[in-house]
């Protein structure tokens, strides 16, 4: 489930990403810069994700937000200046289908351990 579907509400009025469904697709990103007060720059921009359905959501963090991106970088609002260089974050892509098409492999992780690699065999195909 991507961030776009996560914003949908179920019959009980709860967001799907906090109720019945769990996220399984993430983009692992690293903090590259904290030079500007209140902001951090990560290495996940448009070349690793599709934002046609909205920007990604930072998994498990309500205190920071992904607010902008360029081709190769993302800007994270960090009002409390908590993030440090090389900190790792998991992004929930705004739209999973075209995000997957930008990658060659799924890296399958269970309990913090890589357990498999799945090729994205249709990557870049337009038929």
Give residue ranges: language-model regions:
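Active-site anion/phosphate-binding pocket segments in diverse small-molecule metabolic enzymes
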Residues: 1-127
């Amino acid at each position: 489930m991507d961030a776009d579907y996560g914003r949908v509400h179920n019959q009980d009025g709860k967001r799907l990403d906090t109720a019945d469904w769990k996220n399984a697709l993430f983009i692992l990103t690293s903090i590259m810069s904290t030079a500007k007060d209140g902001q951090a720059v990560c290495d996940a921009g448009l070349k690793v994700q599709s934002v046609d359905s909205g920007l990604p959501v930072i998994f498990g963090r309500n205190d920071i937000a992904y607010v902008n991106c360029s081709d190769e970088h993302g800007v994270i609002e960090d009002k409390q200046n908590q993030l440090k260089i090389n900190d790792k974050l998991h992004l929930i892509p705004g739209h999973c289908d075209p995000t997957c098409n930008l990658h060659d492999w799924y890296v399958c992780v269970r309990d913090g351990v890589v357990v498999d690699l799945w090729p994205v065999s249709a990557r870049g195909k337009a038929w």
